[in-house]
Amino acid sequence: MKNYLSALKYCYENGDFVKSRAGNVKKAFGYQMRFDLEKGFPAVTTKKLAWKAVVSELLWFLEGSNDERRLAEILYEDDRENLEDKKTIWTQNAKADYWKNKSNFKGDVGKIYGVQWRDFNGVDQIKNLIKGLKESPDSRRHILTAWNPAELDEMSLPPCHAFSQFYLSNNKLSCQLYQRSCDMFLGVPFNIASYSILIHIIAKECGYDVGEFIHSLGDFHIYEEHFEQVKIQLTRDPKKLPAVSYTHLRAHETS
């Protein structure tokens, strides 16, 4: 994960200090990281990664759900006692004051990632993506997007990781993600892991090997409250990348 630490260092040392909507930040614009998934899974090793939260959210997206309480069911699958009191990374959005008048039910987060992936104006993008990769592997149209301008006002949070393209070469599946807004300390390690898992899932479903995850950052930033933690991060040496093992993965129902 040296390339992640390099991006973090660049932002911390070269970013502009500004007051943003969500707090003071150091921010920069435009950066690309590449992760060769054949060489290991790009999990950050210089701090803890919320692995179960990463996997649970991705599965929730793939279900096409807009129910934050459904995410809680997945996340706390082994401990559902007092589930109503347990939080997820989307709880704050579901309960936000600005969202209350738009929410249709308790836990509603609106037409966010999963809804767009599985029902973008009636289009199941995940199903189409897999079908396209199987039937027309050399196509330049293997696109997955959560950015639906017509429905941004119906989302509790507009998509940060907005647009991705999949690419096949030598039987290896790669993905490039464009992320418009990038929280370098908390969000980006989470996003790297999530899309790398997604590549594994889709590659497995299509019968391909994994290639690269390419992460293109738009507005990438470090919040002032994380400055001290970032400085600690930058003193640590990353460990050897872990490997991912699984017995069975499915990206969608084929029936």
Model-derived features: where do they sit?
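A glycine-rich helix N-cap at a beta->alpha junction
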Residues: 234, 238-246
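Short, Gly/Pro- and small/polar-rich lid/capping loops
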Residues: 1-23
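Conserved small/polar residues in nucleotide/adenosyl-binding loops
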Residues: 247-254
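Glycine-rich phosphate/pyrophosphate-binding loops
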Residues: 173, 199-220
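A contiguous catalytic/ligand-binding core that recognizes phosphate-bearing ligands
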Residues: 63-197, 205-206, 250
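Short, conserved secondary-structure transition motifs
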Residues: 217-229
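An N-terminal structural lobe/cap that precedes and organizes the functional/catalytic core
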Residues: 18-43
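Glycine/small-residue-rich interface belts in oligomeric ring/scaffold proteins
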Residues: 38-69
